[in-house]
Amino acid sequence: MAAKIIGGCCSWRRFYRKRTSSRFLIFSVRASSSMDDMDTVYKQLGLFSLKKKIKDVVLKAEMFAPDALELEEEQWIKQEETMRYFDLWDDPAKSDEILLKLADRAKAVDSLKDLKYKAEEAKLIIQLGEMDAIDYSLFEQAYDSSLDVSRSLHHYEMSKLLRDQYDAEGACMIIKSGSPGAKSQIWTEQVVSMYIKWAERLGQNARVAEKCSLLSNKSGVSSATIEFEFEFAYGYLLGERGVHRLIISSTSNEECSATVDIIPLFLRASPDFEVKEGDLIVSYPAKEDHKIAENMVCIHHIPSGVTLQSSGERNRFANRIKALNRLKAKLLVIAKEQKVSDVNKIDSKNILEPREETRSYVSKGHKMVVDRKTGLEILDLKSVLDGNIGPLLGAHISMRRSIDAI
């Protein structure tokens, strides 16, 4: 009897394990099925969001590009006719101006045609996708095309706003730490990184031509020069000139700063005027200070008191040429600010230094960014330091256009 009970107990245990195993298997299958369903839902939601973003860009391109292309082509034809009736040999300077305008117009036409093609390609992929004729990877391709379209649209729109002298040139940005302290130099390094990331977001290259740190471990930046070798960089960045202040603590007034200056980086031709050799003092700081780059060249313009330098080239000769070009660019900007036609008429006592506060970056509490010139506030410090400064630049450009219109 005992044996039967024991045997029955064993049988029951085997049955229970089997039932439990079966239930566990059914639960696992259901859980797996549920996870697959959720993955499908998430993918569909992502696809819906992707489609909407692409459609928004395509719609904007369809509304904007045809009229813009028609206008640019009309202007191109008119400039070609002007060139036919103009003797290019009579006035070389005027000829260069006409040819440059014609080249710019041709470039705008090609850019708008490319924009239309990419928008049509993205639209076709969306239409095929709605018929389940393509896979998910092609939507990613359409999204990449829509990003190109969006960048091209933004570039074209900005090119119409940035019509001031030198706006279409590249930019040379000179950034200096507000003090020799470690915190200030680390903050300056963050500012440098912010502008590099901004250029990357635009799909453009920005090169740190030279960088110097006075800290023993070489961290941080005491001064740096960034070269933006793409069209309209100067127009984009002109509003960044001034003091960029990091507020570390509102209670103790702890803060540090970096000063930004902007000069044109001429993409087509260097400034076409001569500076008298007698007005220049050329020096090589590395002879006095071993911490400074060996090939650094500084050029001081005696009449204006302006000094520019270069240390990023391979030798002193190349650095001297670059420093002189930077000096000429700075003198042209000052002459424009003072509304004089000749750099020799610059009043050294009225040169505007970049001392005005451009922006405050609050790292405690709300962690926000406040633009002091335009009043714009952005409640996302991290995003701005990651290079998302488009809204800030746009606000400066709009303010400049409003002032010019008065």
Curated annotation (Swiss-Prot):
Gene Ontology molecular-function annotations: mRNA 3'-UTR binding; sequence-specific DNA binding; translation release factor activity
Pfam families in the record, alphabetically? PCRF, RF-1
Do you know which SUPFAM superfamilies this protein is assigned to? Release factor
Question: When the coding gene is removed by deletion, what phenotypic consequences does the entry describe?
Answer: High chlorophyll fluorescence (hcf) phenotype and plant death at seedling stage when homozygous.
Q: Does the keyword Protein transport apply?
A: no
Report the locations given in the UniProt record: Plastid, Chloroplast stroma; Plastid, Chloroplast
Q: Which domain of life is it from?
A: Eukaryota
Coiled coil: which residue ranges? none
One of this protein's GO BP terms? Answer: chloroplast organization
User: GO CC: one term?
Assistant: chloroplast
Q: Does the keyword Chloroplast apply?
A: yes
The record's similarity note reads: Belongs to the prokaryotic/mitochondrial release factor family.
What is the annotated quaternary arrangement, including any partners? Answer: Interacts with PDE338.
Protein name (database record): Peptide chain release factor PrfB3, chloroplastic
The protein's organism comes out as: Arabidopsis thaliana (Mouse-ear cress)
